[in-house]
């Protein structure tokens, strides 16, 4: 499996500068990562720097809490696409989910998908803040929307993706809904395990060390 192309090489630290983003982009070019994942403020810069490459630009909406007003999320998504984003990773409104206002969640996701058209939409459910039963319910809920992916985590909570998360999501998702594992993915073993459990995209800031490890592993044979 060529893991490089299914990695979203990620830099979402609030202290990231334009120079940090340029370094991220150069790494993505060097290691042939499928995408970079950055804050919306850097999308225009990335679009310029990634000209004439196949590397996709992923940005985050309603990040990292998910509690912004829906209209603000829609506008943020619309502007991100206008600036050159190829994919949107939005955070579900976790409070609304917790109080079982499921129609609110469905409407918000579908409104943002309508705003971005054919661009890819991933919905972050922040598994660290959900019980196993809630992860199952959230997966079914996202499956009922027009979202393209369900994503485990922002990377800003107390833990990221786990094996249990992936198993629950796989058991409860629709056939059309893809899985992005993110948060705390620091080594090749994690990535291989999550891939076996159904994840087809990975968000990590440790992409370079993971791929170097993969190369070293291949060279052992």
UniProtKB/Swiss-Prot annotation:
* Location, primary (coarse class): cytoplasm
Q: Which GO terms describe its biological process?
A: 2-deoxyribose 1-phosphate catabolic process; carbohydrate catabolic process; deoxyribonucleotide catabolic process
Look up and give the organism this protein is from: Mesomycoplasma hyopneumoniae (strain J / ATCC 25934 / NCTC 10110) (Mycoplasma hyopneumoniae)
What this protein is called in its record is Deoxyribose-phosphate aldolase
What the entry lists under InterPro entries is as follows: Aldolase_TIM (IPR013785), DeoC (IPR011343), DeoC/FbaB/LacD_aldolase (IPR002915), DeoC_typeI (IPR028581)
Taxonomy of the source species: Bacteria, Bacillati, Mycoplasmatota, Mycoplasmoidales, Metamycoplasmataceae
Q: Reaction(s) catalyzed by this protein?
A: 2-deoxy-D-ribose 5-phosphate = D-glyceraldehyde 3-phosphate + acetaldehyde
Coiled coil ranges (UniProt) are: none
The entry assigns this protein to a family as follows: Belongs to the DeoC/FbaB aldolase family. DeoC type 1 subfamily.
Q: Recorded E.C. number(s)?
A: 4.1.2.4
UniProt-listed Gene3D superfamilies: Aldolase class I
Indicate yes or no for the key word Oxidoreductase. no
Keyword check for Cytoplasm, yes or no. Answer: yes
A Pfam family of this chain: DeoC
Its keywords, alphabetically, are:
Cytoplasm, Lyase, Schiff base
**Where is it located?**
Cytoplasm
SMART domains found in the cross-reference section = DeoC
* Cellular component terms (Gene Ontology): cytoplasm
According to the UniProt entry, its GO molecular function terms are:
deoxyribose-phosphate aldolase activity
């Amino acid at each position: 499996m060529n893991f490089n192309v299914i990695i979203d090489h990620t830099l979402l630290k609030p202290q990231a500068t334009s120079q940090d983003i340029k370094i991220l982009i150069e790494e993505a070019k060097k290691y042939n990562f499928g995408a970079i994942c950055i804050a919306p403020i850097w999308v225009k810069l990335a679009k310029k720097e990634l000209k004439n490459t196949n590397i996709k630009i992923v940005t985050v909406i309603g990040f990292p809490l998910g509690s912004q007003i829906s209209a603000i999320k829609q506008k943020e998504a619309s502007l991100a696409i206008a600036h050159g984003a190829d994919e949107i990773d939005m955070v579900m409104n976790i409070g609304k989910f917790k109080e079982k206002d499921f129609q609110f969640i469905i409407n918000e996701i579908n409104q943002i998908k309508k705003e971005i058209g054919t661009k890819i939409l991933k919905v972050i459910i922040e598994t660290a803040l959900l019980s196993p039963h809630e992860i199952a319910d959230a997966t079914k809920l996202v499956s009922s929307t027009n979202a393209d992916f369900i994503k485990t985590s922002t990377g800003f909570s107390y833990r990221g993706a786990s094996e249990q998360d992936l198993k629950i999501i796989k058991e409860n998702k629709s056939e059309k809904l893809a899985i992005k594992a993110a948060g705390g993915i620091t080594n090749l073993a994690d990535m291989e395990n999550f891939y076996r459990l159904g994840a087809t995209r990975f968000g990590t800031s440790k992409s370079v060390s993971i791929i170097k490890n993969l190369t070293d592993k291949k060279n052992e044979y």
